[in-house]
């Protein structure tokens, strides 16, 4: 292998060269072997990965840089953020010709670290590693995780933890905040070059900045629709955490819902619920408005407005498609919004587990008794009778065969979900040097729709005693 460096060489004014800093007593904890194979990196030895991600030693062709960007954080503009603890090491060309960033998080201080130490802790590194691969397996666009390295280096957060690094990968880590930085720092003349870079390397099928923005709107709308259908709350939807490629980016205090709570907040630094689950679609639009403002003067204003006007329609169209599939419905009917709304009201009112309900709903047949496994989830089954009868009538109108429908529903309603309690158990074991629980959970999450009876204990509801719904931004 030999890395290439188009970002560093073509956009040198958008980054600063920085060497990764070694960790104290690093240890290789996990390699994502399947993904390494897809990217053509199987020839790199475990020793070389440890040397790179733990000891700060270069891979062939590596030119590490920290990228500069800005961002709106909780509604307020921060004019200079950038990679405060992550480095773009270079880009790997995969066997299929695609190009992938190698991005090392926890690599040490950079010119953009401000008051931070440039490190990541094992806890947050495990959470990012698991979440990125879990979302990928669910079909949600995301950065991916390649290598996890732990260490004996003390890192000070709310308490003393140990440092770690994650080598993550994506076609690009370009963010809304990259455009904002140059727009509002008196360097607007750089934006055409940034647009040109995106068009040449990531959107060659598009003609200009107007088409680029329209595609960013479309991808963002579809991404957030997928989050909503999956019950995934990102937690920190600042514009510096929004991908120009429509990827899930920067896993902090994220969370999947358990019981259906529409205003679920997973970040204890968000007491006002700005980034609550049910606010994500509106925040996506707000963030796109900020991107449009940064592009104004470089992209036709009417084209920007026209693209923004399509956001809600695109999001709702895709979300409706996803939810119909989850309910095993093949065609659209005019009353579908009512069916969905009444379901969500019941789920919220009765605290029913979102994922288990949808999985077990696939056992409903057009005739006969209601599945015992489904009724066991419902604290007041009688309250559900009206909705279940309406649902069964809907199935009868479609005439779908029960077994076929169940197979289709199982293929979109996961049995295995990255619940916070599961992640916490894995983290606690890893902090004691036991990676076996991590390996089991990682493997199960690779195939979330399969039965996998050998991992059955990982498919149970979040325990009632677990109250860890909100998490810290510290990582």
UniProtKB/Swiss-Prot annotation:
Can the keyword Transport be found in this entry's annotation? Answer: no
One matching Pfam family: SelO
Top enzyme class, one word, equals transferase
What are the required cofactors?
Mg(2+); Mn(2+)
**Could you name the active-site residues?**
240 (proton acceptor)
What's in the keyword line of the UniProt record? ATP-binding, Magnesium, Manganese, Metal-binding, Nucleotide-binding, Nucleotidyltransferase, Transferase
A GO term, aspect molecular function: ATP binding
Superkingdom, according to UniProt? Answer: Bacteria
Q: Which reaction does it catalyse?
A: L-seryl-[protein] + ATP = 3-O-(5'-adenylyl)-L-seryl-[protein] + diphosphate; L-threonyl-[protein] + ATP = 3-O-(5'-adenylyl)-L-threonyl-[protein] + diphosphate; L-tyrosyl-[protein] + ATP = O-(5'-adenylyl)-L-tyrosyl-[protein] + diphosphate; L-histidyl-[protein] + UTP = N(tele)-(5'-uridylyl)-L-histidyl-[protein] + diphosphate
Residues binding Mg(2+) are 241, 250
Residues the entry annotates as binding ATP: 82, 84-85, 105, 117-118, 168, 175, 250
What Enzyme Commission number(s) does the record list for this chain? 2.7.7.-, 2.7.7.108
Q: Does the keyword Nucleotide-binding apply?
A: yes
Which InterPro entries does UniProt cross-reference here? SelO
Annotated HAMAP family: YdiU_SelO (MF_00692)
Q: What this chain does, per the record?
A: Nucleotidyltransferase involved in the post-translational modification of proteins. It can catalyze the addition of adenosine monophosphate (AMP) or uridine monophosphate (UMP) to a protein, resulting in modifications known as AMPylation and UMPylation.
Q: State the family it belongs to.
A: Belongs to the SELO family.
Q: What is this protein called?
A: Protein nucleotidyltransferase YdiU
Write down the species.
Answer: Aeromonas hydrophila subsp. hydrophila (strain ATCC 7966 / DSM 30187 / BCRC 13018 / CCUG 14551 / JCM 1027 / KCTC 2358 / NCIMB 9240 / NCTC 8049)
